Curated annotation (Swiss-Prot):
SUPFAM superfamilies: 4'-phosphopantetheinyl transferase. HAMAP family: AcpS. The gene is acpS. The keyword Transferase applies. This is Holo-[acyl-carrier-protein] synthase. Transfers the 4'-phosphopantetheine moiety from coenzyme A to a Ser of acyl-carrier-protein. GO terms for molecular function: holo-[acyl-carrier-protein] synthase activity; magnesium ion binding. It is found in: Cytoplasm. Mg(2+) binds at D8, E59. Its EC number is 2.7.8.7. It comes from Zymomonas mobilis subsp. mobilis (strain ATCC 31821 / ZM4 / CP4).
Amino acid sequence: MIIGIGTDLCNIDRITTILGKKESGRFIKRLFSCEEIEASSAFSMTKAAFFAKRFAAKEAFVKALGTGFRHSISFQDISISNDSLGAPKVNISGKAALLLEEKKPPRHTLSIHLSLSDDHPWALAFVVIEACPE
């Protein structure tokens, strides 16, 4: 059963402009986890495209959750990583994890599916939260 669907677009050029400012470090540390920041060096895409896709993924996730960034959810509660095959995945903690748990029907497990894409100047994220019977 589908619990929620969310999608978001982020303009890569907007992130490029932000990264060019001297206060960009504050922006990056506020929106992205240490793991995400560290991983940004390992990808061949530009840092702006890397961060734009992850920003879009976080926005898409809270839309799928049905809350947006209300209820004290922070960007740090949502971290985007890649599995061993390179597929993106959503990792949640804090208030985001608590709110997701409230959405889970009894005797079900939850899965978060994430798809990312970019075609300059746009980065796209699509999230589906699914509940499956145990």
